[in-house]
């Protein structure tokens, strides 16, 4: 394919035979061709702000065998060619349109296109500005869940969409920065990923809770909580609850009373037993932060806080 929209094809059953006349043009809008992929029985041609669809029209050689599916043109294009991911029945990509801004789009079938990014994700995407063109994505299927793994170069962050849960999370290698694996494949019925610089190939093992021997930082952080009043609150007890583990599975608990500027010294609870913290001081608005780095499973349901409201 060429940037001006020409999509060439080889002769039928002759992949090495290319003819200068065997092409069809993506020309519904005057945007540049960015990339393409296959979805069901159509070819998706992504422009800067539109996406056209082509099908096998059985046109005889030397012309292109393809025909345009006119009613299938989507009014959203692609901002980053390496963000295009085909997963079974869906296609994901970082979209752009004439109205401006970047979003993550999902195409189900050939006509049901929808935005799956949240306002928070869109804010980070738009902060990339022209660097959005270098965004990279790949698919993962682990433990029955499909993930769209999207890395942004300018912000040095990786965001992951779980299609089954309709939920976004952020992945890192170590305690900060992006997830440093750039592509995925399948091997022995499991997912494998390739490291961006040293060529290490790792497998996803749902019984191992480390990143190639290093801790995985699982961090849960709440928004500031005021209990619907600006009165002082005395926190008497804080308890996490979730799955009870068969071995020690510690979680560090911290809190911030100044909008994340500073956090308290970490104190530890163990999910092997029912345990809680006491003597947690006073606050008007408090954000909680829970950090798990042990090589153990963790599944939390929530937390319980016992507090006493003051008069002022």
Predicted regions and their residues:
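Beta-propeller and closely related beta-pinwheel folds
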Residues: 2-136
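Beta-sheet repeat architectures centered on beta-propellers
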Residues: 73-91, 96-312
